């Protein structure tokens, strides 16, 4: 089953999250972290694919502090908007991720996977948050050695 739910962060911010629940007992929980485009059809499809593999999957909407359900296109203007939003909410986004981890941890072990900016957040989540058993960063950005 797929649906959008509302969660709350520890700093009392309400945000939406897309949930994909398998029909049978989940193998574990998975937090899917968006790119700079929001929780768009690509991210929802990623959630559905992991759900078909048996995982309780959640994608927090990290731009909800700016406005609900922000979805950007892959155009030059929207990429610019996404970069601005990324900079504005980069540090705060761990709050939404933490609440999402707490939501899916009842399914068992919890993984975090992120794409581009979300990959950077997945890396940070694995380093800074508790209750995460695995963190995967796909083509991450913002990590400097």
What are these regions (language model features)?
Residues 119-129:
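Short glycine-enriched nucleophile-adjacent loop
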Residues 71, 143-145:
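Conserved small/polar residues in nucleotide/adenosyl-binding loops
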Residues 114-118:
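Gly/Ala-rich beta-loop-alpha elbow adjacent to hydrolase catalytic centers
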Residues 5-105:
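Serine-hydrolase catalytic machinery in alpha/beta-hydrolase-like enzymes
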Residues 25, 108, 130:
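Structured loop/turn residues at beta-strand edges in well-structured enzyme cores
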Residues 131-140:
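A conserved short beta-strand
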């Amino acid at each position: 089953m797929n649906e959008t739910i509302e969660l709350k962060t520890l700093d009392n911010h309400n945000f939406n999250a897309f949930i994909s629940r398998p029909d049978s007992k989940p193998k574990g929980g998975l937090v899917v972290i968006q790119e700079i485009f929001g929780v768009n059809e690509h991210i929802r499809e990623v959630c559905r694919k992991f759900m078909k593999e048996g995982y309780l999957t959640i994608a927090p909407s990290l731009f909800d502090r700016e406005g609900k359900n922000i979805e950007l296109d892959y155009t030059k203007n929207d990429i610019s908007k996404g970069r601005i939003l990324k900079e504005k909410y980069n540090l705060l986004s761990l709050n939404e991720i933490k609440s999402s981890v707490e939501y899916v941890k009842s399914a068992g072990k919890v993984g975090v996977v992120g794409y581009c900016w979300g990959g950077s957040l997945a890396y940070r989540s694995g380093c800074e948050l508790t209750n995460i058993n695995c963190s995967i960063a796909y083509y991450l950005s913002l990590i400097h050695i």
